[in-house]
A protein has these predicted regions:
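Short, positively charged and aromatic/hydrophobic N-terminal segments
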Residues: 10-13, 17-38
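Extreme N-terminal basic, low-complexity initiation segments
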Residues: 2-10
Length: 343
C-alpha cells in the first residue's frame, strides 16, 4: 500500500518527501515478502547489491558488470537467442534516465555469451517525443542510445503506432486475464529489465515492476491498466495556466467561462499525465482505490511478460527524481544515490 506517497512527492520540503518515501518503501517491501511467503510459498530470489563507492581504478561500469555476474547473468543460456533489454530512453529534456553506458555493459555481457541483445521500450499514451516509433527512435538517439554507444540496436516493441502487440495470458490473473504486450518483447527468448528507482505521481514510486508492467504494455495495454480511475479538478486551486491541456493526449481537458480546467470523463484515458503537469495540486485522482487497482494490474502485466522464459533484473537506485522519466524535466533527487541491485 503506497497511499500517501504521491502527495508527499509534491511537498516542497525534501525532508518530508524522504521520510515518507523511505517508510512507505519499507512497508511495501515487508508486505510483498509476507504475501509471497504466505500465499505462494515461493522462495524469494536472491538479490545482489553493490554501492556506488569506487576506489581508484574501479568504475561504476566495472561494479555493474561484477554485480550482474554475481547475480547469475552468465548462468543464462543466451547462445543464438534474442535478448530484450527493457529500459526507458528518457523524454527529451529529462536528464534523470539511465546513461547509455550502463546499457552497453549489459548488452556486452549478453554478446559474450552468444546472445543477440537489443534495447527496447513501447510507445506512450500521451504527447511528447515517444508517442510513435519514429519520434521514439529519434528521442533515443538524441539521448545517446544507438549502436555506437550501447553495442546493440534499439527496437520499439509495439511498432509505429503502438498497435503491434501480442495478447498473452496472465498467470493466475485476478484483474487482467490477458495482457497486451509489445510484440518484439514477447518475441524475445530472454528478458532483461534495466531501470532506475524514482518517484511517480500515480503509483508512488517506480522501478523494476513499473518498467516491466507498464513499460512493456502496448498503447492498448497501457489504457487497460490506467482504466481504474480518472482524475478530477479542484477548481478553486486551478490557475487556468493550460499546462494540463497541453499534456493531455486525449483532448479531454477544456476550460469553462472562468478559465478553470474541466476534464471530459468520456474522453479521459486515465493516464495521469495531467496530475503531474499541474503545479498547483488542482488535479487529483478520484479515489485511492484507483491507484491501488493500477498497481495490481501493473504487477499482473509484469508477471505476463516474465512468465515462461529466463529473466534478469537490474535496478540502479540513483537520480531518484520525484517524477518518472516520462516528464520533459527532472527535479532535484529526493534521496541520495544508494547502489545497484541485480537478481
Amino acid at each position: 500500500d503506497v497511499e500517501g506517497v504521491p502527495a508527499a512527492l509534491y511537498d516542497s520540503t525534501f525532508s518530508l518527501q524522504k521520510d515518507v518515501l523511505y517508510y512507505k518503501i519499507r512497508e511495501y517491501a515487508a508486505a510483498c515478502r509476507a504475501n509471497k511467503m504466505e500465499e505462494t510459498a515461493m522462495e524469494a530470489s536472491k538479490v545482489y547489491y553493490t554501492d556506488f563507492r569506487c576506489p581508484v581504478g574501479t568504475s561504476l561500469l566495472d561494479k555493474l558488470r561484477r554485480v550482474c555476474i554475481a547475480a547469475g547473468i552468465k548462468d543464462i543460456d543466451m547462445d543464438g537467442k534474442f535478448v530484450a533489454i527493457k529500459m526507458h530512453f528518457g523524454e527529451l529534456g529529462n536528464l534523470a534516465f539511465l546513461r547509455p553506458n550502463y546499457a552497453k555493459v549489459v548488452a556486452d555481457l549478453c554478446k559474450e555469451q552468444g546472445g543477440l541483445p537489443f534495447l527496447t521500450d513501447c510507445n506512450t499514451l500521451y504527447p511528447g517525443s515517444r508517442k510513435n516509433a519514429l519520434e521514439h527512435l529519434t528521442c533515443a538517439q538524441l539521448n545517446g542510445f544507438w549502436p555506437m554507444t550501447t553495442g546493440c540496436q534499439v527496437i520499439i516493441a509495439d511498432g509505429l503506432r503502438g498497435t503491434d502487440e501480442a495478447e498473452v495470458p496472465v498467470p493466475n490473473g485476478e484483474y487482467c486475464k490477458t495482457a497486451k504486450i509489445g510484440r518484439a518483447i514477447m518475441d524475445a527468448d530472454i528478458f532483461i529489465s534495466l531501470t532506475h528507482f524514482k518517484g511517480h505521481e500515480s503509483t508512488g514510486f517506480g522501478g523494476t515492476l513499473k518498467n516491466i508492467g507498464m513499460g512493456c504494455g502496448s498503447r492498448a495495454g497501457k489504457m487497460i491498466q490506467h482504466a481504474a480511475g480518472h482524475p478530477e479538478v479542484q477548481q478553486s486551486l486551478c490557475r487556468g495556466c493550460h499546462r494540463c491541456a497541453k499534456e493531455c493526449g486525449s483532448d479531454a481537458i477544456t476550460y469553462d467561462a472562468n478559465n478553470k480546467a474541466v476534464i471530459d470523463q468520456t474522453k479521459c484515458k486515465g493516464c495521469g499525465r495531467c496530475i503531474g503537469a499541474c503545479n498547483f495540486d488542482a488535479i487529483y485522482s478520484q479515489c485511492d482505490s484507483a491507484n491501488e487497482m493500477l498497481d495490481r494490474k501493473m504487477a499482473e502485466y509484469a508477471a505476463a511478460v516474465c512468465a515462461g522464459r529466463p529473466c534478469f533484473h537490474v535496478s540502479l537506485v540513483q537520480d531518484i527524481s520525484p517524477n518518472c522519466d516520462c516528464h520533459c524535466e527532472n527535479d532535484a533527487p529526493i534521496l541520495p544515490d544508494i547502489g545497484i541491485f541485480a537478481s
